[in-house]
C-alpha cells in the first residue's frame, strides 16, 4: 500500500476535519485513505501517467520531518503503546521525528474508529486522524506502521503510474466495489525520486487484497518469485524513499522546508499533466 503524496492537490481536503467529528464529510478511498470530495475528485483525475513510485511532492510532506501527535480520549494504554511502537519503528530507520503535540496547529491524532486507515500526507490544517482499529480489535503493528506511511505521504505502492510493468491486475477476481482500490496515478501528484518499484514495500497490497473468493488472486507480480503485501516492517526501499523524500542529512535530520504554491510550481512536477479525477490524491483516507 504505498504511494507518496505528490504535493499538488491537498488543499481542499484540509477543510473537512470537524473538531468533534473527525471523519465528517470525508470519503474512504482505496479502503484506508480518507479524503474530501474535492480531494477525491482530484486524486481520481491523475491515474494514467508514467512517474515512478507513489510519493508525494514536498508541499504535502511534514516540514522538517516533524510530526506532532496526540491520542483521542478513547485510546487506552494498549493503544498508546501500539502507536508508539509504530512511531519508533519509523524514527529508528528514518529522520522522521514524532513528538507529543504542544501548540502546533497541524498534527496527527490516533483514534479508534474500528478501521485501520489514515489521511494521506501533510494537509497543514487541523488534526489528521490515524485510526488504529478498536480497543477490542486493534490493528496489528505492521498495519499501524503502514497507516503512518500514508500519514507521512505514501500512497499505495501499486498506485504508481508504472505499476502495470510490475503487477498484473485481475479485475474478475475483485469483489464488487474494490476496483477503486487499484487506481493508479498519472504522474500529477507522484514524485518517485528516481526509485524503483518495490514489491517488498510495507505500502504494497497483497495478492489477495480485495478478492471475491478465498485464495482468488487479484494482483500478481510479474517478476517471478516476488512477494507482495508484507507487514513485518519498512523495506530497504521504504527507508531509502523516505530519507530522500524528507531530505535527511548525514546527521539524521530532515532539511525539508515548508513549500508554498509558487515554490512548488518551480520545483519539479509535470506542468503538462492535469490531475486525473479518477486517480489517488493527497488528503484522502487510505487503509
Swiss-Prot record:
Tissue expression pattern: Nematocyte and pharyngeal gland.
Disulfide links within the chain: 95-248, 116-139
UniProt enzyme class: hydrolase
Superkingdom assignment: Eukaryota
GO molecular function per UniProt: metalloendopeptidase activity; toxin activity; zinc ion binding
Cofactor(s) essential for the protein: Zn(2+)
Location (main, coarse): secreted
Cofactor note: Binds 1 zinc ion per subunit.
Biological processes annotated in GO: proteolysis
The enzyme's E.C. designation: 3.4.24.-
Basic and acidic residues biased stretches: 268-287
Record: residues binding Zn(2+): 146, 150, 156
Protein name: Nematocyst expressed protein 6
Organism: Nematostella vectensis (Starlet sea anemone)
Amino acid at each position: 500500500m504505498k504511494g507518496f503524496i505528490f504535493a499538488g492537490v491537498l488543499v481542499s481536503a484540509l477543510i473537512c476535519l470537524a473538531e468533534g467529528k473527525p471523519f465528517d464529510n470525508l470519503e474512504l478511498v482505496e479502503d484506508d485513505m480518507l479524503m474530501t470530495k474535492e480531494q477525491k475528485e482530484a486524486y481520481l483525475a491523475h491515474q494514467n501517467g508514467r512517474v515512478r513510485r507513489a510519493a508525494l511532492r514536498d508541499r504535502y510532506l511534514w516540514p522538517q520531518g516533524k510530526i506532532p501527535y496526540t491520542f483521542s480520549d478513547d485510546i487506552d494504554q494498549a493503544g498508546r503503546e501500539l502507536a508508539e511502537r509504530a512511531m519508533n519503528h519509523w524514527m529508528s530507520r528514518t529522520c522522521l521525528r514524532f513528538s507529543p503535540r504542544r501548540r502546533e496547529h497541524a498534527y496527527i491524532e490516533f483514534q479508534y474508529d474500528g478501521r485501520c486507515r489514515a489521511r494521506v500526507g501533510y494537509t497543514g490544517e487541523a488534526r489528521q486522524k490515524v485510526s488504529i482499529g478498536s480497543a477490542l480489535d486493534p490493528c496489528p503493528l505492521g498495519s499501524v506502521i503502514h497507516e503512518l506511511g500514508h500519514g507521512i505521504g505514501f500512497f499505495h505502492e501499486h498506485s504508481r503510474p508504472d505499476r502495470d510493468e510490475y503487477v498484473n491486475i485481475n479485475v474478475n477476481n475483485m469483489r464488487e466495489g474494490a476496483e477503486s482500490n487499484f487506481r493508479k496515478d498519472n504522474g500529477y501528484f507522484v514524485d518517485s525520486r528516481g526509485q524503483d518499484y518495490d514489491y517488498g514495500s510495507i505500502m504494497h497490497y497483497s495478492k489477495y487484497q480485495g478478492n471475491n473468493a478465498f485464495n482468488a488472486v487479484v494482483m500478481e507480480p510479474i517478476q517471478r518469485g516476488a512477494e507482495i503485501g508484507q507487514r513485518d516492517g519498512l523495506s530497504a526501499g521504504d527507508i531509502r524513499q523516505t530519507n530522500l523524500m524528507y531530505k535527511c542529512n548525514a546527521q539524521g535530520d530532515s532539511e525539508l522546508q515548508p513549500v508554498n504554491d509558487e515554490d512548488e510550481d518551480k520545483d519539479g512536477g509535470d506542468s503538462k499533466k492535469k490531475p486525473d479525477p479518477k486517480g489517488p490524491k493527497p488528503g484522502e483516507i487510505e487503509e
